[in-house]
Amino acid sequence: MVDIIFHYPFLGAMGDHSKKKPGTAMCVGCGSQIHDQFILRVSPDLEWHAACLKCAECSQYLDETCTCFVRDGKTYCKRDYVRLFGIKCAQCQVGFSSSDLVMRARDSVYHIECFRCSVCSRQLLPGDEFSLREHELLCRADHGLLLERAAAGSPRSPGPLPGTPPGLHLPDAGSGQQVSLRTHVHKQAEKTTRVRTVLNEKQLHTLRTCYAANPRPDALMKEQLVEMTGLSPRVIRVWFQNKRCKDKKKSILMKQLQQQQHSDKASLQGLTGTLLVAGSPSAHENAVQGSAVEVQTYQPPWKALSEFALQSDLDQPAFQQLVSFSESGSLGNSSGSDVTSLSSQLPDTPNSMVPSPVET
């Protein structure tokens, strides 16, 4: 139904239509009293001058010969109302005619030619499975590909390592290219090479057991580890530092992986579900949301009085004939034949009203 608002913003300066006196007609358009012979009435109690009732878009005059629509306090002709507020195709944004066949997908309506997959542009026929994602149609094949890509994730190029000078490039792993780092830092004097310390299984087991109990051992614990492993204090100190750094990097990486998995699951929530099945085309009967408001003509009370006066003027000759008949009867100048001819013109008395003779 068309929403008709009875309280309009412009009635404050033009007069309140709801507080009009009984028997008076106030124009909703200009707010003044209507003294015209005819009043255009829209809905039960909205009345206009004939010159005030017009379309808000094209200014076409509206009367009882055309269809009028009221929305948000404005009047529209049928053409502009369909153009502004009618149902449009979700693909081409063009309105429908009453003879068009449409395809429906949930709350969206499409032309038959516009009901296509947004990826491969294949027209979806009745019985085809499809999905509706962000107001875009996807056929079954493209829907499956989208699910696979979202589950696998798009490959990302590795970003620059922290602390790497600009201009350095690291090729992808497995490409077979040699990593080349070119810097503009001046070469420093060659330093003495350090001997790499190789730990055996027993030493590693001792250090790992101590690290599991306390990742930051104190000086007394380090002295005991020196006696137990036979390693230098510097080697033990560096091993604990490297172990703490590796564990910290591993925890950060695991946290990032968990966040990535959570975001992938959230992105897949809009894609999972049962595929829709295209139905048969249906006729688009209601091209306009709402029903038209009938515009009627209204005749004021004085119009009925004037018609009654005209009718009484037409009946005046018969009244004069009866008056002349009464005057002729009072003077006694009329003959019996005149009375008989005049009485023959009068209607006969019904039989039902003739009294029956009373038996004595």
From Swiss-Prot:
Annotated compartments: Nucleus
Keyword Magnesium: no
Chain positions covered by the region annotation LIM-binding domain (LID): 273-302
Recorded coiled-coil stretches: none
Gene Ontology biological process: axonogenesis; negative regulation of neuron differentiation; neuron differentiation; neuron fate commitment; neuron fate specification; positive regulation of transcription by RNA polymerase II; retinal ganglion cell axon guidance; spinal cord motor neuron cell fate specification
Biased composition (Polar residues): 338-360
PROSITE patterns, per the entry: HOMEOBOX_1, HOMEOBOX_2, LIM_DOMAIN_1, LIM_DOMAIN_2
Annotated region (Disordered), positions in chain: 151-177, 328-360
Domain LIM zinc-binding intervals: 25-86, 87-149
Protein name, per record: Insulin gene enhancer protein ISL-2
Species whose genome carries this gene: Rattus norvegicus (Rat)
